[in-house]
């Protein structure tokens, strides 16, 4: 169902003379065009009826509204829905019809009032809320701005500073805080919500409660000079934090116009900006990510078979290192009882200590109470053998990347675990078929690849072999959802989706450095592009041991298209291992602050002499644009291989995997979306040119060559891919 035929409102007039309008658009009563137009007609009817004294707006099934139906943007871009004139909804309907009405309205808020939902509530003359309701304007994280008057009403209700905090961080507040801020007029139990709202509306009519038009309020606004200072500071901070995104600054402009020139001018500016931001590339990228993230759990041939997830009552984890302890933390935080197995008491104590430290950091930050900490820790039990595995529903192996060790573990697990138990490996690079070679029940072997730190990073790669049952995938998708991860189901290959796509990223950077490029300029250019850090800073962070082990797997499996640099092995010989030893590509002080190391030059020169690479003046003086293209186009090339081989069913899954696993900037939409925004023809021509000049590493794969020569979208579905899912 698209936004043209989605949702409705229902109006009921009681004997007390209050018309209750209910928003109905499951699951969160989003404000589709249909809902908004229905609301308009209900309002017009209520205003024209003599038996209606006041109006209450509420949402069906315990939720007020989750905001504007974002699919409406997509429908407008496709031309399926005519875009309303700028300000039609925010000014003509919400301000001039609803807020300026001669009959008062009260919002009865339960569950959530987010985005357009909160904006609608703020236009009412009072707001009554249930205690658990969440109130916020999260639009900026979706690439748009509050477009239903939120830029004008929120500062007038809660003050400019708090409004900026809520809008710029996209973080909601609970009803009690909303009440203390002045956003909510009263907090009542859910059962009394509509009754209280009706009474409040009649009290406004009887002048026992104030009739407040929030857009006209000025008592919470600071003096003009102070407001300008606050906004100037907010703009500087925003530019520093998100230099590649225009929409937050455009949002601040709308707020400023309203404060300087009055609310009407502010609403007009907001309407103008709202219609402009939907055309920005960053907005298109963020909206693509929003929908793609929700689509990763839909796997053709798996989730469309009516399979019901089995209940996972207990999980065992083998290995209490950084990864194993992180996975254990994620599970117990979501109320899963966990057994953590180690080889000796010392390692077990250390593993449990890591889990404890992960939770204690939450207590220190105030996001977890001491009581909750103790209750959560009680879900974790330690073990030195497999005896306690006899009643577990899932085991996740998280030991070092050693094939024979993993094979032995999986063979042992089969002897102790029940028949239904899922046998999962957290390997990041090793072929799952090899890991399960000595195991008879291949249908329950699956990859559960978390990213470090596992209790924080949002991605879970679910890796399916040719034998893994659909039921196991459905079970793991359910676990992923419950532990608040975004699961992406991929096929089995070296490196799976994320590590495989991105192995050329670091190798391309190493190649450029050996040819004369400055590593620090490369890191700067890539950080400026939007990555959390550049490839050299990343190598230091993960440590050279991990970097070498990972690179070795790819060099062994894809020798024809890898670049083997000796820079890291040479540094490792000199006891440099990255940030942990305070020496890597950078030098680190006591606070782990990085600074360039003049000694790096000697390792680069030595590596260059070993590889036989000659200094190339052209590559030594690359522009930022060239650096981005030469490091990321090989990633696009490998992503095309992954897609063509059926390792991923949808290009959008690769977009989400890259964003959540490697920190690819979300506002660029993901690696495949970004590639399509540049054009397959251009990417193909550049890679082809570099492969002729610098070798096989840059050679476009057949999939990219075919699509690039015709200018076809790289993300278009693969019609006859032999899917590995």
Swiss-Prot record:
Disruption phenotype: Accumulation of long-chain acyl-CoA substrates and increased size of peroxisomes. Gene3D superfamilies: 1.10.1040.50, 2-enoyl-CoA Hydratase, Chain A, domain 1 (3.90.226.10), NAD(P)-binding Rossmann-like Domain (3.40.50.720). It comes from the Eukaryota. InterPro entries: 3-OHacyl-CoA_DH_CS (IPR006180), 3-OHacyl-CoA_DH_NAD-bd (IPR006176), 3HC_DH_C (IPR006108), 6-PGluconate_DH-like_C_sf (IPR008927), ClpP/crotonase-like_dom_sf (IPR029045), Enoyl-CoA_hyd/isom_CS (IPR018376), Enoyl-CoA_hydra/iso (IPR001753), NAD(P)-bd_dom_sf (IPR036291). A motif (Microbody targeting signal) lies at residues 723-725. The active site is at 119 (nucleophile), 139 (proton acceptor). Highly expressed in senescing leaves and at lower levels in flowers and siliques. Pfam families: 3HCDH (PF00725), 3HCDH_N (PF02737), ECH_1 (PF00378). Coiled coil: none annotated. Involved in peroxisomal fatty acid beta-oxidation during seed germination. Possesses enoyl-CoA hydratase activity against long chain substrates (C14-C18) and 3-hydroxyacyl-CoA dehydrogenase activity against chains of variable sizes (C6-C18). Possesses 3-hydroxy-3-phenylpropionyl-CoA dehydrogenase activity and is involved in the peroxisomal beta-oxidation pathway for the biosynthesis of benzoic acid (BA). Required for the accumulation in seeds of substituted hydroxybenzoylated choline esters, which are BA-containing secondary metabolites. This is Peroxisomal fatty acid beta-oxidation multifunctional protein MFP2. The gene is MFP2.
């Amino acid at each position: 169902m698209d936004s043209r035929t989605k949702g409705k409102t229902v109006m009921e007039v009681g004997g007390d003379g209050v018309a209750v309008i209910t928003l109905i658009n499951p699951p969160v009563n989003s404000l589709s065009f249909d809902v908004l137009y229905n609301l308009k007609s209900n309002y017009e009817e209520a205003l024209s009826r003599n038996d209606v004294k006041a109006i209450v707006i509420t949402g069906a099934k315990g939720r007020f509204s989750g905001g504007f139906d974002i699919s409406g943007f997509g429908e407008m871009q496709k031309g399926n829905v005519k875009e309303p004139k700028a300000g039609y909804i925010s000014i003509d309907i919400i301000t001039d019809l609803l807020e300026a009405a001669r009959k008062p309205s009260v919002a009865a808020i339960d569950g959530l009032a987010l985005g357009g939902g909160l904006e609608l509530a703020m236009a009412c003359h009072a707001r009554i809320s249930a205690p658990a309701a969440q109130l916020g304007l999260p639009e900026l994280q979706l690439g748009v701005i509050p477009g239903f008057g939120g830029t004008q009403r929120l500062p007038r209700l809660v003050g400019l500073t708090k409004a900026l905090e809520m809008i710029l961080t996209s973080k909601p507040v609970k009803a009690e805080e909303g009440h203390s801020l002045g956003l909510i007029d009263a907090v009542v139990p859910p059962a009394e919500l509509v009754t209280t709202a009706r009474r409040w509306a009649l009290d406004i009519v009887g002048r026992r409660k104030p009739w407040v038009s929030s857009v006209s309020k000025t008592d919470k606004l600071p003096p003009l000079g102070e407001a300008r200072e606050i906004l100037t500071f907010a703009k500087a901070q925003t530019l520093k934090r998100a230099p590649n995104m225009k929409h937050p600054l455009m949002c601040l402009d709308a707020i400023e116009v309203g404060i300087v020139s009055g609310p009407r001018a502010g609403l007009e500016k907001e309407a103008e900006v709202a219609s402009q931001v939907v055309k920005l590339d960053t907005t298109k990228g963020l909206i693509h990510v929003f929908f793609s993230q929700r689509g990763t759990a839909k796997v053709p041939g798996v989730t469309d078979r009516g399979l019901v997830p089995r209940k996972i009552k207990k999980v065992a984890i083998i290995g209490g290192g950084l990864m194993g302890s992180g996975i254990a933390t994620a599970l117990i935080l979501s109320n899963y009882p966990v057994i953590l197995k180690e080889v000796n008491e010392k390692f077990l104590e250390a593993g449990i200590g890591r889990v404890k430290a992960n939770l204690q950091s939450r207590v220190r930050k105030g996001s977890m109470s001491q009581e909750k900490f103790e209750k959560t820790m009680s879900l974790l039990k330690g073990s030195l053998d497999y005896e306690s595995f006899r009643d577990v529903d899932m085991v996740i192996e998280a030991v070092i990347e050693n094939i024979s060790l993993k094979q032995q573990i999986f063979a042992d697990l089969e002897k102790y675990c029940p028949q239904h138990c899922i046998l999962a490996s957290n390997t990041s690079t090793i072929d799952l078929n090899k890991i399960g070679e000595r195991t008879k029940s291949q249908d329950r072997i699956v990859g559960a690849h978390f990213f470090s730190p596992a209790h924080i990073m949002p991605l879970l790669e679910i890796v399916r072999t040719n034998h893994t049952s659909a039921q196991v995938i459905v079970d793991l998708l359910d676990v992923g959802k419950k532990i608040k991860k975004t699961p992406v189901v991929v096929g089995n290959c070296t490196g799976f989706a994320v590590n495989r796509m991105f192995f050329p990223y670091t190798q391309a950077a190493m190649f450029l450095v050996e040819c004369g490029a400055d590593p620090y300029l490369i890191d700067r250019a890539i950080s400026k592009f939007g990555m959390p850090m550049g490839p050299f800073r990343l190598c230091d962070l993960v440590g050279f041991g991990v970097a070498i082990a990972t690179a070795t797997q790819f060099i062994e499996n894809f020798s024809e298209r890898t670049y083997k640099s000796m820079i890291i092995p040479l540094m490792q010989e000199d006891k440099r291992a990255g940030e942990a030893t305070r020496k890597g590509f950078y030098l680190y002080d006591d606070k782990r602050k990085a600074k360039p190391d003049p000694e790096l030059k000697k390792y680069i020169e030595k590596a260059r002499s070993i590889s036989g690479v000659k200094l190339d003046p052209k590559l030594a003086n690359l522009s930022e644009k060239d650096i981005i293209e030469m490091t990321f186009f090989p990633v696009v090339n490998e992503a095309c291989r992954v897609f063509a081989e059926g390792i991923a069913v949808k290009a959008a899954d690769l977009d989400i995997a890259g964003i959540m696993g490697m920190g690819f900037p979300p506002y660029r939409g993901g690696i495949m979306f970004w590639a399509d925004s540049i054009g397959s023809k251009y990417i193909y021509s550049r890679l082809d040119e570099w492969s002729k000049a610098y070798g096989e590493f840059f050679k476009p794969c057949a999939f990219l060559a075919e699509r690039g020569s015709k200018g076809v979208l790289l993300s278009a579905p693969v019609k006859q891919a032999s899917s590995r899912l």
